[in-house]
């Protein structure tokens, strides 16, 4: 066992490694741990092989578990938004959490962040830790201004919520109550089933719940309510009565809605139980219907508005054509549930009766079949669109039994033949309204770099994901700590290559500061310690936006100077009485620093160098302290000297107390007496002889350099928790030889301060003070826009596959980094274009805010079609999904063109407003919907002639000439663009 009764480090490492592999089980409790603390713990216990050299090193001791980085300020349980598993936090089962707390305790004032495991999915069940709880606003019917916020798990029941509300508002147990959902415009819906979970009930983030108490005369303040279905009852908490009397009580209620100027109760049909218009607004323009935000569901609202304003798809659902094609038996589908739910929603939105609807039932259905969308976290609009298009396709697939098809390579055959074959094969398994409207065909060409094997395939697509020209640079904020100890750190903003290394950062900082790049050391400081000390060749991608990057000036040549060593130094405050079960009796404070010192040094010289390095914020009293004696420290003579830290290296306490007066030394400052704190040459001022840092009589005997007291003691740490014997025996790292202290690159130094001395002499405000360089105010110049066609050209540019995504060459029988080229063969009636604005890496997430200039009308795609029979292929924009904000979060809206009046509108959740074309092109544009011009004929026209299906899209040969189709506008199509009809 380790110190304080904690398990030894090998046991800790083994236990936690095993518990991290624990399977999730519904109902279990797991705990969040800040990933930065956990990484520090991994270093301390040597969890990973590359951290073994730091195992047991007190300089990387993690201290109490600190989850403050996960929490919003001032709230012990409210998590910051958009935290990501493993990047921001680690999940531990209860046993693992309890072990860590027993070994390290939890930071004072913090509470455990416990979360339940919930089950998600309808057919394919899987468990997930519910990191973000659902925040509900609770109030009483008689006083809705007094709102209390509480957080619940999606696994909690309505009964659990009701009990909590009763407790909050001190409602007696015998008092009969019932619960209501309160929506916008004072619209209410009763919660009927006490055993329903929050997830089943579809309660969303920020939902207002109202508890209503029954009047003394037996009536309800809100009046009676209508059950959803025969036999259903409103959720009420009643005194103990028989089931029969309970049934009679509700059966005697009037089946009517109660409405007044303040509220209305809805009728309970499929959507009407929660979809409302504002009172008095029942004659809306069809399609101009907003969607209520259920809590971070703007991504869904934006996607739905774009699909809703896709004329051929909406006409298909409004005309009930979907009912004939529902596929309930498709194993890849959702038993028709997604299609039916979407159809009901579209009918509500286009009924002209509502100014907005609440898509709660649709959201619930999506979450059942796609658990990643079941919560109320911000999601990607394009990812939801991909799911909806695929889900609708499978629910409406006209193919009831999919045949097995052997895919063939081109093997030198003409593109026209291979394309026709590929499209026919696709239609044998996939034939739906989604295929009719959204599917196109592209050509993929792979070339092996070894044997020159060429592989050509034709593959269908539902949308185009277009890359944007990547930003080649990023800005980083760093703090430069100069050698001059009197100079405050300075904050800089540097522009560095996005795919660069630490040397690039130093070079950029050198241009601003004048300090040579080779005289810089870049570090990441976290929780008062060095989290990382970077090598010059490390990638900048490992630096995240939230990291505190400090760059230290070191005036030595690290490759040639053999006389000096760079030592990391951290500051610790001693505890007089530690209540921690496993702690060294100290806690870190202040900012650590790096300094270069001679390899051969005396303890006294090192102490003096350290004191001078901190002279800006360590204030020495100028009053003589007769009772303690004095140690004189020259205020200025050792600053800006010839040493690697801007100070002289020759001074020692005895040398500095010279009898030869000068103008500088006459300003001597006094330190307290050292007689109580002198160090033996073996202990180096360590903790081994006295827990409070004071030497015993034996260790101090014969080692006094005068009646002087030091402000701090210091302790060296290397591969482990260094003790006296280790220092004496292991001459590879630290040793004494004729009272000389030997150091090397593996040495770490901790300065231990007595709390009283720290309070008296250490100025924390001065230590944390810094200045700002003018570069901090730098704003990058406006980036020039790119055209949509530039993105399409980039999409069709030849590229080399990455090492992590090779292609298996059938000739070489090996995976190769082949060259790949994509080309467009045929395009669908509605072209969905996804602008790839978000980029991901192991350490960084980023959003590209490049302005893409896309045409509203007359997007000519003909030049990008390699089909030799392709003719004119022009598109008009019909909808745009917008994303405002950064990578971690933001807001989605939509622009869409109404199919009935041909005007543009702006959809922002429940709000709908008119828009002009000059508003549409912006940096926020994320997903574009284009409809081909030859599919417009009147209002929402789209031909669905089942007789014309075949390989025409693949071949590019029109089924009939324009002259043949003059008699029937419904047959006009440019088959060179269209793939099936």
UniProtKB/Swiss-Prot annotation:
Phosphorylated. Phosphorylation protects against ubiquitination and subsequent degradation by the proteasome. Residues 216-237, 629-694, 952-981 are annotated as: Disordered. GO terms for cellular component: cytoplasm; cytosol; mitochondrion; nuclear body; nucleoplasm; nucleus. Its EC number is 3.4.19.12. Keywords: Acetylation, Cytoplasm, Host-virus interaction, Hydrolase, Mitochondrion, Nucleus, Phosphoprotein, Protease, Thiol protease, Ubl conjugation, Ubl conjugation pathway. Residues 2-223 are annotated as: Mediates interaction with SART3. Signal peptide: none annotated. Residues 289-933 form the USP domain. Pfam families: DUSP, Ubiquitin_3, UCH, USP7_C2. It is an enzyme of class 3 (hydrolase). The modification Phosphothreonine is found at residues 226, 602. Expressed in skeletal muscle, kidney, heart, placenta, liver, thymus, lung, and ovary, with little or no expression in other tissues. The modification N-acetylalanine is found at residue 2. GO terms for molecular function: cysteine-type deubiquitinase activity; cysteine-type endopeptidase activity; deubiquitinase activity; identical protein binding; K48-linked deubiquitinase activity; SMAD binding; transforming growth factor beta receptor binding; ubiquitin-modified histone reader activity. Disulfide bonds: none annotated. Residues 7-118 form the DUSP domain. The keyword Lipoprotein does not apply. GO terms for biological process: BMP signaling pathway; monoubiquitinated protein deubiquitination; negative regulation of antifungal innate immune response; negative regulation of transforming growth factor beta receptor signaling pathway; positive regulation of RIG-I signaling pathway; protein deubiquitination; protein K27-linked deubiquitination; proteolysis. CDD domains: Peptidase_C19R. A homodimer structure has been reported; however it is unclear whether the protein form a homodimer in vivo. Identified in a complex with the COP9 signalosome complex (CSN). Interacts with SMAD1, SMAD2 and SMAD3; the interaction is direct. Forms a complex with SMURF2 and SMAD7. Interacts with TGFBR1. Interacts with SART3; the interaction is direct. May interact with RNF20 and RNF40. May interact with PRKN. Interacts with INCA1. This is Ubiquitin carboxyl-terminal hydrolase 15. It comes from Homo sapiens.
């Amino acid at each position: 066992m380790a110190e304080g009764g904690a398990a030894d480090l090998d046991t800790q490492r083994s236990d936690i490694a095993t518990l991290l592999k624990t399977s999730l089980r519904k109902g279990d409790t797991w705990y969040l741990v800040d990933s930065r603390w956990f990484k520090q713990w991994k270093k301390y216990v040597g969890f990973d092989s590359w951290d073994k050299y730091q195992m047991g090193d007190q300089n990387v001791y993690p201290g109490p578990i600190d989850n403050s980085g996960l929490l919003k300020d001032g709230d012990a349980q409210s998590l910051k938004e958009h935290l990501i598993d493993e990047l921001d936090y680690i999940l531990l089962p209860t046993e693992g959490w309890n072990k860590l707390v027993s070994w390290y305790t939890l930071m004072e004032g913090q509470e455990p962040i416990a979360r339940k495991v919930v089950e998600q999915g309808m057919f394919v069940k899987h468990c997930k830790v519910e990191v973000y709880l659902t925040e509900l606003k609770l109030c009483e019917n008689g006083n809705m201004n007094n709102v209390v916020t509480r957080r619940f798990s999606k696994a909690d029941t309505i009964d659990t919520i009701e009990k909590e509300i009763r407790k909050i508002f001190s409602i007696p147990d015998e008092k009969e109550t019932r619960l209501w959902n309160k929506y916008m415009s004072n619209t209410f819906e009763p919660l009927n089933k006490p055993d329903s979970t929050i997830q089943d009930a579809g309660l969303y983030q920020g939902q207002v719940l109202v508890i209503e108490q029954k009047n003394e005369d037996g009536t309800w303040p809100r009046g009676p309510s209508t059950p959803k279905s025969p036999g259903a009852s409103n959720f009420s908490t009643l005194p103990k009565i028989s089931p029969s009397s309970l049934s009679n009580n509700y059966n005697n209620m009037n089946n009517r809605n109660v409405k007044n100027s303040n509220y209305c109760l809805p009728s309970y049909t499929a959507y009407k139980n929660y979809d409302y218009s504002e009172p008095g607004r029942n004659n809306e323009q069809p399609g101009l219907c907003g969607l209520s935000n259920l809590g971070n569901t703007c991504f869904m609202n934006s996607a739905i508005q774009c699909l809703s304003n896709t004329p051929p798809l909406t006409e298909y659902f409004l005309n009930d054509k979907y009912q004939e094609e529902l596929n309930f038996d498709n194993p890849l589908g959702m038993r028709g549930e997604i299609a039916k739910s979407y159809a009901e929603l579209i009918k509500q939105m286009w009924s002209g009766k509502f100014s907005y609807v609440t898509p709660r039932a649709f959201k619930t259905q999506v979450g059942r079949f796609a658990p990643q969308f079941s919560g109320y976290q911000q999601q990607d609009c394009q990812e939801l669109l991909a799911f909806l298009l695929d889900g609708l396709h499978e629910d409406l697939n006209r193919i009831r039994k999919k045949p097995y098809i052997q895919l063939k390579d081109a093997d030198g055959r003409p593109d026209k033949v291979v394309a026709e074959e590929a499209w026919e094969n696709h239609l044998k398994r996939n034939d739906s309204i989604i295929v009719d409207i959204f599917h196109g065909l592209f050509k993929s060409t792979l070339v092996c770099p070894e044997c020159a094997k060429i592989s050509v395939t034709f593959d269908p697509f539902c949308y185009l994901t277009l890359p944007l020209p990547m930003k080649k640079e990023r800005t980083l904020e760093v703090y430069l700590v100069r050698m001059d100890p009197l100079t405050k750190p300075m904050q800089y903003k540097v522009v560095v290559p996005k795919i660069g290394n630490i040397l690039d950062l130093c070079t950029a900082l050198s241009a601003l500061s004048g300090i040579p790049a080779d005289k810089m050391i870049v570090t990441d400081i976290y929780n008062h310690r060095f989290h990382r000390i970077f090598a010059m060749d490390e990638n900048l991608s490992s630096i995240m936006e939230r990291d505190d990057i400090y760059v230290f000036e070191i005036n030595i040549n690290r490759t040639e100077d053999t006389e000096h060593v760079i030592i990391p130094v951290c500051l610790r405050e001693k505890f007089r009485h530690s209540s921690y079960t496993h702690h060294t009796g100290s806690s870190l404070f202040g900012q650590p620093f790096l300094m270069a010192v001679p390899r051969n040094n005396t303890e006294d010289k090192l102490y003096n160098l350290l004191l001078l390095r901190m002279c800006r914020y360590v204030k020495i009293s100028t009053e003589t302290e007769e009772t303690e004696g004095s140690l004189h420290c020259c205020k200025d003579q050792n600053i800006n000297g010839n040493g690697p830290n801007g100070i002289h290296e020759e001074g020692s306490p005895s040398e500095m107390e010279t009898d030869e007066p000068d103008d500088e030394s006459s300003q001597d400052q006094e330190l307290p007496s050292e007689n109580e704190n002198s160090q033996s040459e073996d202990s180096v001022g360590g903790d081994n002889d006295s827990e409070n840092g004071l030497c015993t009589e034996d260790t101090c005997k014969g080692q006094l350099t005068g009646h002087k007291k030091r402000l701090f003691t210091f302790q060296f740490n290397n591969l482990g928790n260094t003790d006296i014997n280790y220092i004496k025996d292991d001459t590879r790292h630290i040793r004494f030889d004729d009272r000389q202290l030997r150091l090397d690159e593996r040495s770490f130094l901790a300065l231990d301060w007595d709390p009283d001395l720290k309070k008296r002499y250490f100025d924390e405000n001065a230590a944390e003070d810094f200045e700002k360089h003018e570069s901090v105010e730098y704003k990058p110049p406006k980036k020039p826009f790119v055209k949509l066609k530039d993105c399409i050209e980039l999409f069709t540019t030849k590229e080399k596959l990455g090492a992590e995504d090779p292609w298996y060459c059938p000739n070489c029988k090996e995976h190769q980094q082949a060259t790949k080229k994509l080309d467009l063969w045929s395009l669908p009636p509605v072209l969905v274009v996804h602008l790839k604005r978000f980029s991901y890496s192991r350490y960084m997430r980023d959003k590209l805010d490049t302005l893409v200039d896309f045409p509203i009308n007359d997007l000519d795609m003909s030049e990008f079609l390699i089909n030799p029979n392709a003719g004119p292929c022009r598109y008009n924009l019909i909808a745009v999904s917008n994303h405002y904000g950064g990578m971690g979060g933001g807001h989605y809206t939509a622009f869409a063109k109404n199919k009935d009046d041909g005007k543009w509108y702006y959809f922002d959740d429940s709000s709908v407003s008119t828009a002009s074309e000059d508003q549409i092109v912006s940096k926020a544009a994320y997903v574009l919907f284009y409809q081909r011009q030859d599919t417009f004929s009147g209002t929402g026209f789209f031909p669905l002639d089942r007789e014309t299906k075949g390989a025409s899209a693949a071949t590019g040969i029109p089924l009939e000439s324009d002259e043949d189709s003059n008699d029937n506008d419904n047959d006009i199509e440019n088959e060179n663009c269209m793939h099936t009809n």
